C-alpha cells in the first residue's frame, strides 16, 4: 500500500456563518450585538422614556438594567430600547439593541423560514440581512403581525422559528404584548412548551415597572433559564444554513477552476471570504464554546484557506485567521482568563506522502516520535511543587479559560504528582495534554444525555469539548472524560534531553501518556507508521484524526524553533475523510451566472467528516452518467473536510429495481429557454437567455455586489432576487439608478407598512458610495468572460480609462502583460453586444467612475521581473504586496516556475518555497524584498 490514496482534502466552503461584534443601522431603532455564545444578562424595555434599574435612565446615562432571575450572569446584554439612549461604555447608542441568543444562527433561521428554506413572507424578518458571502450587512426592520414590530416584538423575532401573519410561532401562539412606559409586557400565552417551541417547559417573561425583568418557568427550548443560552436553544446547524439551501453548483465549479485566468476568478474573493468566515466562526466555537465540527474538519478548512492564500496572494487580508493560534477567550465566557506560562502553539498539517517527505527532508533528525493525534480538547496543566495549581483551555495560545475545578474531577489528572528517585518533582511544571471521551463510552454518554432531556452530541470530540466547559463539576464527572499528555511547556527544575525522556518523566509522576507513541529513525519508517495507522485508526482507545511526527531531540527542537502559530519540529499528518453511504433522493439543476445549468444531488441527510450533508454537486450531465448514479440509489459520499461533499458513485448491490435515470431538462428551470451547449464538444449546457433569465441575472447582481467587484454590502442574493422578481430591475444597467420610489415595490427593502426599511436605505447609500471606485472593479463587475481581477488590473493599469480600452485594437490589448489574445478577444466581443454597451453607458450616466485618476508613477524598479510571494510578510498584506510589485512594473505570479525571477518567502511559507529551492531560484526574505522594491537590486 502507498499513501497515494491518502490525499489532501480540497474544495471550497460556501455558506459561512459570520462572527461580527457590532452592527449599527443608521436612522433606525435597531442595533445588533453579534456573538457566538451569549448569556442573557440584562433586559431593559423602554419606549422613549426613562427606564433603568431605578427607572432613572436618561439619554446618555449609563444603563445596565437589572440582573435576571438570579442566574443570568455575564457581559453579553440583551437590550431592546425604543427611542431611548443608552450609554454602553463610552458609546451612546440612540438605537435599539437586540442581542439574539447565539448570534447569527438565529437570524439566519428566522429570515429564511423553516429548515426547508422557503421564501420570507410578511410577518417574518423583512430585509436581506445575510449577505451572500455570509456577512451581516444590516439588521432589517422586523415586520410582524399587527404592526408589533413598532413595539417589543422585534426582540422575539430573533428566536427560533418564524413569525407569520397569523401570529403563529412554530405552531404555538404568542402571548399578549403590552409595551409602554411603566407598563408590563408579557410573553406567555400558550407558553413555549413541547408543542409550541420544540421542547422545554413553559416560560413567561415579564418586564415590570421601570425596567426590571423576571423569568417565570423552568426552561426555554430545553435550556435552563438562569443558565447559559446556547446552540441547543434552536438546534441551528451552520452546515445546513437555510439561507444557502444549496450553493449554486456552477459557482462551486467556478471556485474549483481558480487555477486559470477566467471570468470566474472573481469568485475567488468570495470563496476566500466564505472560508475565512467559516474558519473564524468554527475557531471561536472550537476553542471557546461547544464545537460543531471535529478537529479534522476545522483543520481541513484552515488548510484550504492557507492554500488559497498561497495560490492567490491578492486575496488575503491582515487579520487572516491563518496567522493566528486558537481564538481569544470571549467576554461571554463563564470562566476566568488565565495566562499560559509558555505559549501553547498549534500544529501545521500535511495531507499526502509528498508533503510529508518534504517536511522530513527539511527537518532531518536522528530520531522521530510518532504519536496518534487525539481528536479531543487541548488542556494546559500547571503543577507547583507537585500540586495541581490550575488547568486551562488553549484559548489563543497565550490566554485560556480557567477550568481548574472541572479538571480536578477527571480521573486521569492527578491532584498531586508522585516523585521518584530518577525523576524528582520540578518546582514548576506546565503539562500539555488532550481531553477526550473514549469511543466505547461515547454511546453511553449520549444515551444518558438524551435521557436527561438533552440533545445527543455529534461525536466524541464535541462531547469532550462541551463537557469540559460545564459550569458544574459534578456534571463533568458524569461524562467519563479521559486525558493523555503529549508535551511539556514551561518548567523549573526539569530539562529533558528528548521528547521520549519527557514522556518517561510524565509517566513516572503519575500523568497518563500514550501507549501508541513509537520512536523511528528514518523517513521510510515514519511513512510506514502513517500507513499502519491509516488502516488501524479505529483500533485506538480514542478517536484520532492523524499522526503527529516530532523531532525527538530537545536541542534540535530549540534550534528549529517555531513560526507564529506552530513549531517547526513537529507536523501532523492528516488522514483522508470518511466515506459514508446515503440515499440519493433526487437530482435537480440550478442556473449560474454564466448560464451554466448544473445538476446537484439531493440526499437523505448523512453525517460525514464532522457535519451533516444533504446536497452535493454533480457538475454536468456527463458526470452524472460517468458516475453511473440513478435517482433512488444508495450512493457513497465523501467529504474531505470542505463544505462541498462529493458523490463518488452508487452501491449497485443495493439496487432494488425502483431506481430511475436522471433526465437532463430541455428547458431552463428559471426562464423556460431551450438549453444547449455553447459548442458541440462542451460538457456544460447553458441557458441562452443571458440578459433576462432571472437565475443568471440574480447571480450577476450578486456578483456585482461582491467584494471582488463593487462591494455593495446591502445587496445580497435575496435582495437581488427580490429586485428581479418585482420587476424593479430587468438587467444590471439600472442598478445605480435605483431610487427610494423604486424600492417601494420591493418585499425585501420595505416594511409591512410600505416604507423603505433600513436595508433599503443602506442599499441606496451603498450604491451612491460605490459609484466612485477603481476602474478594474468596474471591469470585473461586467462579467466579461475571462476578465477576472488579474486581467482587469492589468488592463485598467495600462489604459486607465474605459473609453481608451473600448477604442484600443484587439492586438494592442493582447500585448498587455498578463492578458493575451484570448482575453483581449473576449473583451472586444463583449462590447459588440448592444445591451452590454448599454450597461456601461447607463452606469456612466448614473455617475459611476469610468477612469482612474492620474497618479505619480513609481520608479519601475521591477520592470520585466516575475515575482512570487509565499507566506506572510510583516509589512504587507496579500493585496498590498501584489500592488507593490505591479505598480513598479513587475509581474506578481501565483506559481513558481523556471521563469520566476525571485521568490519572496515569509512566515508559514508553503510548498512554493521548497519548489523554488529545487529549481535553484533566488529566494528573498522580506528585508531583501524591500530593497528590491526600492532599488531594483538585492
Swiss-Prot record:
One record GO biological process: DNA repair
GO cellular component labels: cytosol
SMART domains found in the cross-reference section: BRCT (SM00292), LIGANc (SM00532)
Alphabetic keyword roster: DNA damage, DNA repair, DNA replication, Ligase, Magnesium, Manganese, Metal-binding, NAD, Zinc
Segments of this protein annotated with the region DNA ligase: 261-938
Domain BRCT residue range list: 857-938
Active-site residues (renumbered): 373 (n6-amp-lysine intermediate)
Residue segments, region Unknown: 1-260
Cofactor: Mg(2+); Mn(2+)
Pfam family name, one: DNA_ligase_OB
EC number(s) per entry: 6.5.1.2
The protein's enzyme class: ligase
Binding of Zn(2+), residues: 668, 671, 687, 693
Keyword DNA damage: yes
GO MF entries: DNA ligase (NAD+) activity; metal ion binding
Known catalytic reactions: NAD(+) + (deoxyribonucleotide)n-3'-hydroxyl + 5'-phospho-(deoxyribonucleotide)m = (deoxyribonucleotide)n+m + AMP + beta-nicotinamide D-nucleotide
Binding residues for NAD(+): 295-299, 346-347, 371, 394, 434, 550, 574
Family statement drawn from the similarity comment of this UniProt entry: Belongs to the NAD-dependent DNA ligase family. LigA subfamily.
Function: DNA ligase that catalyzes the formation of phosphodiester linkages between 5'-phosphoryl and 3'-hydroxyl groups in double-stranded DNA using NAD as a coenzyme and as the energy source for the reaction. It is essential for DNA replication and repair of damaged DNA.
Protein name: DNA ligase
This protein's encoding gene: ligA
Amino acid at each position: 500500500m502507498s499513501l497515494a490514496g491518502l490525499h489532501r482534502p480540497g474544495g471550497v466552503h460556501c455558506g459561512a456563518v459570520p462572527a461580527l461584534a457590532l452592527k449599527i443601522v443608521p436612522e433606525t431603532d435597531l442595533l445588533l450585538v453579534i456573538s457566538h455564545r451569549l448569556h442573557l444578562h440584562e433586559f431593559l424595555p423602554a419606549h422613549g422614556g426613562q427606564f433603568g434599574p431605578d427607572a432613572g435612565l436618561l439619554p446618555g446615562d449609563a444603563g445596565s438594567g437589572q440582573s435576571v432571575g438570579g442566574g443570568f450572569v455575564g457581559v453579553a446584554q440583551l437590550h431592546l430600547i425604543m427611542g431611548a439612549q443608552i450609554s454602553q461604555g463610552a458609546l451612546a447608542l440612540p438605537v435599539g439593541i437586540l442581542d439574539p441568543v447565539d448570534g447569527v444562527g438565529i437570524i439566519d433561521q428566522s429570515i429564511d423560514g423553516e429548515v426547508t428554506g422557503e421564501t420570507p413572507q410578511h410577518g417574518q424578518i423583512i430585509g436581506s440581512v445575510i449577505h451572500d458571502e455570509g456577512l451581516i450587512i444590516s439588521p432589517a426592520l422586523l415586520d410582524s403581525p399587527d404592526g408589533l414590530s413598532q413595539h417589543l416584538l422585534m426582540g422575539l423575532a430573533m428566536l427560533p422559528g418564524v413569525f407569520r401573519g397569523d401570529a403563529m410561532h412554530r405552531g404555538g401562539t404568542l402571548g399578549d404584548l403590552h409595551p409602554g412606559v411603566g407598563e408590563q409586557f408579557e410573553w406567555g400565552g400558550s407558553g413555549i412548551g413541547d408543542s409550541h417551541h420544540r421542547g422545554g417547559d413553559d416560560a413567561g417573561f415579564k418586564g415590570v415597572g421601570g425596567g426590571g425583568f423576571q423569568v417565570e418557568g423552568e426552561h426555554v427550548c430545553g435550556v435552563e433559564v438562569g443558565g447559559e443560552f446556547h446552540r441547543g436553544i434552536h438546534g441551528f446547524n451552520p452546515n445546513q444554513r437555510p439561507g444557502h439551501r444549496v450553493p449554486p453548483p456552477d459557482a462551486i465549479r467556478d471556485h474549483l477552476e481558480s487555477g486559470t485566468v477566467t471570468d470566474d476568478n472573481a469568485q475567488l474573493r468570495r470563496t476566500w471570504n466564505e472560508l475565512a468566515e467559516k474558519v473564524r466562526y468554527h475557531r471561536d466555537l472550537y476553542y471557546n464554546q461547544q464545537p460543531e465540527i471535529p478537529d479534522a474538519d476545522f483543520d481541513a478548512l484552515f488548510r484550504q484557506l492557507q492554500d488559497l492564500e498561497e495560490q492567490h496572494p491578492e486575496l488575503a487580508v491582515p487579520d487572516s485567521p491563518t496567522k493566528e493560534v486558537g481564538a481569544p477567550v470571549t467576554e461571554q465566557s463563564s470562566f476566568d482568563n488565565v495566562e499560559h506560562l509558555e505559549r501553547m502553539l498549534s500544529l501545521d498539517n500535511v495531507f499526502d506522502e509528498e508533503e510529508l517527505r518534504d517536511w522530513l527532508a527539511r527537518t532531518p533528525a536522528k530520531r522521530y516520535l510518532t504519536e496518534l493525534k487525539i481528536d479531543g480538547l487541548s488542556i494546559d496543566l500547571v503543577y507547583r511543587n507537585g500540586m495541581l495549581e490550575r488547568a486551562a483551555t488553549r484559548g489563543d495560545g497565550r490566554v485560556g479559560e480557567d477550568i481548574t475545578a472541572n479538571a480536578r474531577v477527571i480521573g486521569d489528572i492527578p491532584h498531586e504528582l508522585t516523585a521518584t528517585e530518577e525523576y524528582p518533582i520540578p518546582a514548576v511544571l506546565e503539562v500539555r495534554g488532550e481531553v477526550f471521551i473514549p469511543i466505547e463510552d461515547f454511546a453511553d454518554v449520549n444515551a444518558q444525555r438524551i435521557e436527561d432531556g438533552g440533545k445527543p452530541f455529534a461525536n466524541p470530540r464535541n462531547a469532550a469539548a462541551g463537557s469540559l466547559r460545564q459550569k458544574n463539576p459534578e456534571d463533568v464527572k458524569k461524562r467519563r472524560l479521559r486525558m493523555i499528555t503529549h508535551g511539556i511547556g514551561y518548567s523549573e527544575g526539569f530539562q529533558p534531553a528528548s521528547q521520549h525522556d519527557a514522556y518517561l518523566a510524565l509517566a513516572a509522576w503519575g500523568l497518563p501518556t500514550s501507549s501508541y507513541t513509537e520512536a523511528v529513525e528514518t523517513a521510510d519508517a515514519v511513512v510506514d507508521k502513517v500507513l499502519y495507522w491509516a488502516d488501524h485508526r479505529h483500533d485506538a482507545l480514542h478517536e484520532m484524526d492523524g499522526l503527529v511526527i516530532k523531532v525527538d531531540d530537545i536541542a534540535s527542537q530549540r534550534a528549529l524553533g517555531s513560526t507564529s502559530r506552530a513549531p517547526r519540529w513537529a507536523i501532523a499528518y492528516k488522514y483522508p475523510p470518511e466515506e459514508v453511504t446515503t440515499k440519493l433522493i433526487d437530482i435537480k439543476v440550478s442556473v449560474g451566472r454564466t448560464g451554466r445549468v448544473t445538476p446537484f444531488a439531493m440526499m437523505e441527510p448523512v453525517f460525514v467528516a464532522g457535519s451533516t450533508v444533504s446536497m452535493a454537486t454533480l457538475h454536468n450531465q456527463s458526470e452524472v452518467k460517468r458516475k453511473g448514479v440513478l435517482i433512488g440509489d444508495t450512493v457513497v459520499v465523501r467529504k474531505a473536510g470542505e463544505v462541498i461533499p462529493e458523490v463518488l458513485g452508487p452501491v449497485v448491490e443495493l439496487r432494488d429495481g425502483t431506481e430511475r435515470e436522471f433526465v437532463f431538462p430541455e428547458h431552463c428551470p428559471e426562464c423556460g429557454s431551450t438549453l444547449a451547449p455553447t459548442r458541440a464538444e462542451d460538457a456544460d449546457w447553458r441557458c441562452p437567455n443571458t440578459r433576462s433569465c432571472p437565475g443568471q441575472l440574480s447571480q450577476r447582481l450578486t456578483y456585482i455586489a461582491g467584494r471582488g467587484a463593487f462591494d455593495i454590502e446591502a445587496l445580497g442574493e435575496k435582495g437581488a432576487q427580490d429586485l428581479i422578481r418585482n420587476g424593479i430591475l430587468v438587467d444590471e444597467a439600472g442598478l445605480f439608478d435605483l431610487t427610494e420610489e423604486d424600492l417601494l415595490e420591493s418585499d425585501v427593502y420595505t416594511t409591512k407598512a410600505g416604507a423603505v426599511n433600513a436595508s433599503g436605505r443602506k442599499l441606496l447609500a451603498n450604491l451612491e458610495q460605490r459609484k466612485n471606485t477603481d476602474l478594474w472593479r468596474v471591469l470585473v463587475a461586467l462579467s466579461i468572460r475571462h476578465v477576472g481581477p488579474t486581467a482587469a488590473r492589468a488592463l485598467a493599469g495600462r489604459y486607465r480609462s474605459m473609453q481608451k480600452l473600448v477604442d484600443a485594437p484587439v492586438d494592442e490589448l493582447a500585448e498587455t502583460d498578463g492578458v493575451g489574445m484570448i482575453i483581449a478577444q473576449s473583451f472586444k466581443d463583449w462590447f459588440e453586444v448592444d445591451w452590454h454597451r448599454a450597461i456601461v453607458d447607463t452606469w456612466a450616466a448614473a455617475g459611476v467612475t469610468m477612469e482612474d485618476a492620474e497618479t505619480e508613477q513609481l520608479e519601475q524598479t521591477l520592470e520585466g521581473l516575475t515575482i512570487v510571494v509565499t507566506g506572510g510578510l510583516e509589512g504587507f498584506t496579500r493585496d498590498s504586496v501584489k500592488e507593490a510589485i505591479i505598480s513598479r512594473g513587475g509581474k506578481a505570479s501565483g506559481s513558481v516556475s523556471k521563469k520566476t525571477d525571485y521568490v519572496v518567502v515569509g512566515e508559514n511559507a508553503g510548498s512554493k518555497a521548497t519548489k523554488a529551492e529545487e529549481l535553484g531560484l533566488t529566494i528573498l526574505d522580506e528585508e531583501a524584498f524591500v530593497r528590491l522594491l526600492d532599488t531594483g537590486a538585492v
